[in-house]
């Protein structure tokens, strides 16, 4: 069984508090008839601060999709290489040991993929398998983990590097006055992670026992982008807030098949921080004590929703807290489709 090793996390230089974001929106849209409601909803997100790749005042002057794409590629190349090198070191491997590189990102576009840059910059083998994942949004991190697990199961030498990169601030549309645009502008943050999945049993971490996927039919409208001249415009249907009740039975089934116990009996959880409501629904539907998702809530509070990077941030927090050897756990994320990706396993100390 393959093992997820300790991730490397990087955050951009600029930081914004939620109060600063509220002040910014009030100044930009001082005559908006629903600003008071937007303010209350933003305060209810449980996000305290986020990191941005550019200062908010610079982002508020939309300089065009071309300029934002240049910033995206520049920072993607720079930050991904730093994170990747640290992750490979964390795993006790060298660049020559990597057989696959997966990259997840839904907040910008590059061709060739960032996987090509990483192969060149890190000096990976020319036979390295590439897996760029661009359209799974927040669930992409967990999807990459599950696909890397599939690859690692083929050979004990099939170590995989997973890089997740999200610059959601580059999708900020300052002139979009819809209520959900205000909320998303105050919810999503920027971050980069890298993590190695070792295909052998020679490292501590989250050893995956079984994975699962679930697609909710007729839910494409829940989470989507409208692609316009100004870039990506994020839209969110309120129905997504009630989606966990449909996914929870599949999570319970996967857990019971693997451990012969309910999710609530697990020792730890690595959950995507879709927002306060999603975490509340996970607690409710899986019959968990609220404190069981504290690390996901901490991630949301300290960095916002960092999309496909979230599961790696929460995984790193697990490493920092040090679960006992043999502790059982579940990793799960949710995103467009509506799609869920899950993995269950045990902690190797």
UniProtKB/Swiss-Prot annotation:
Where is the chain membrane-spanning? none
Give the GO molecular function terms: acyltransferase activity, transferring groups other than amino-acyl groups
Q: Which GO terms describe its biological process?
A: antibiotic biosynthetic process; polyketide biosynthetic process
Give the enzyme's EC designation. 2.3.1.253
Sorted alphabetically, which InterPro entries does this protein's record hold? Chalcone/stilbene_synt_C, Chalcone/stilbene_synt_N, Polyketide_synthase_type-III, Thiolase-like
Q: In which pathway does it act?
A: Antibiotic biosynthesis
**Cysteine disulfide links:** none
Protein keywords:
Acyltransferase, Antibiotic biosynthesis, Transferase
Active site (catalytic residues): 138
UniProt enzyme class: transferase
Q: Which reaction does it catalyse?
A: 3 malonyl-CoA + 3 H(+) = 1,3,5-trihydroxybenzene + 3 CO2 + 3 CoA
Please summarize what the entry says happens upon disruption of the gene: Mutant cannot produce monoacetylphloroglucinol (MAPG) or 2,4-DAPG.
Q: Which SUPFAM superfamilies match?
A: Thiolase-like (SSF53901)
Its family remark reads:
Belongs to the thiolase-like superfamily. Chalcone/stilbene synthases family.
Which function does this protein serve?
Answer: Type III polyketide synthase that catalyzes the synthesis of phloroglucinol from three molecules of malonyl-CoA. Required for the synthesis of the polyketide antibiotic 2,4-diacetylphloroglucinol (2,4-DAPG).
Query: What is this protein's name?
Result: Phloroglucinol synthase
Organism name: Pseudomonas fluorescens
């Amino acid at each position: 069984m393959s093992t997820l090793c300790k991730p490397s996390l990087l955050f951009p230089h600029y930081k914004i508090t939620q109060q600063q974001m509220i002040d910014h929106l009030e100044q930009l849209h001082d005559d908006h008839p629903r600003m008071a409601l937007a303010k209350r909803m933003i305060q209810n997100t449980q996000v305290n601060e986020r990191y941005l790749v550019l200062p908010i005042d610079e982002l508020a002057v939309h300089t065009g999709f071309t300029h934002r794409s240049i910033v995206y590629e520049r920072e993607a190349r720079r930050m991904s290489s730093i994170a990747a090198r640290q992750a490979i070191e964390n795993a006790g491997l060298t660049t020559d040991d990597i057989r696959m590189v997966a990259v997840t990102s839904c907040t910008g576009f590059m061709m060739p993929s960032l996987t090509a840059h990483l192969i060149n910059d890190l000096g990976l083998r020319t036979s390295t398998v590439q897996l760029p994942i661009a359209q799974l949004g927040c669930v992409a991190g967990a999807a990459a983990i599950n696909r890397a697990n599939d690859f690692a199961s083929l050979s004990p030498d099939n170590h995989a590097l997973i890089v997740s990169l999200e610059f959601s601030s580059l999708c900020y549309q300052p002139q979009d006055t819809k209520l959900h645009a205000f909320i998303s502008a105050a919810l999503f943050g920027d971050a980069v992670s890298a993590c190695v999945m070792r295909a052998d049993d020679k490292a501590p971490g989250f050893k995956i026992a079984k994975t699962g996927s679930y697609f909710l039919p007729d839910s494409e409208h829940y989470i989507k982008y409208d692609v316009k001249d100004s870039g990506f415009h994020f839209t969110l249907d309120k129905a997504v807030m009630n989606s966990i009740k449909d996914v929870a039975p599949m999570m319970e089934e996967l857990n019971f098949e693997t451990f012969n116990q309910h999710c609530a009996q697990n020792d730890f959880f690595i959950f995507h921080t879709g927002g306060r409501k999603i975490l509340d629904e996970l607690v409710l539907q899986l019959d968990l004590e609220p404190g069981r998702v504290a690390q996901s809530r901490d991630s949301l509070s300290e960095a916002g929703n960092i999309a496909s990077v979230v599961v790696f941030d929460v995984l790193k927090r697990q490493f920092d807290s040090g679960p006992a050897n043999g502790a059982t756990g579940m990793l799960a994320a949710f995103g467009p489709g509506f799609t869920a990706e899950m993995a269950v396993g045990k902690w190797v100390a």
